[in-house]
Amino acid sequence: MAHKKGQGSTQNNRDSAGRRLGVKKFGGEFVRAGNIIIRQRGTKVHPGNNVGLGKDHTIFALIDGVVKFERYGKDRQKVSVYPVE
């Protein structure tokens, strides 16, 4: 066994902090305009009605209302916000 670590092993053992991605408001929840609904990398979930898409693919509410997740196409998902009647 080596009695010195060697160059490779001393450079490993680092990791980055988690990015706190995921769904922040679930289906059926009430949101206000500007609330973040999903933080994601790429458009895993696509924007539907009354939601905006940020430059980092964050989906956020444009109006006050209720969140609804919907399927469209064969294998895509979208999220919309509908006003409360």
Curated annotation (Swiss-Prot):
Keywords: Ribonucleoprotein, Ribosomal protein
Range of residues in the leader sequence: none
MF term (GO), any: structural constituent of ribosome
GO cellular component labels: cytosolic large ribosomal subunit
A GO BP annotation: translation
Positions of region (Disordered): 1-21
Keyword Zinc: no
Gene3D superfamilies in the cross-refs: 2.40.50.100
UniProt family annotation: Belongs to the bacterial ribosomal protein bL27 family.
HAMAP family associated with the record: Ribosomal_bL27
Full protein name: Large ribosomal subunit protein bL27
Naturally occurring in which organism (per UniProt): Nitratiruptor sp. (strain SB155-2)
Name of the gene this protein is made from: rpmA
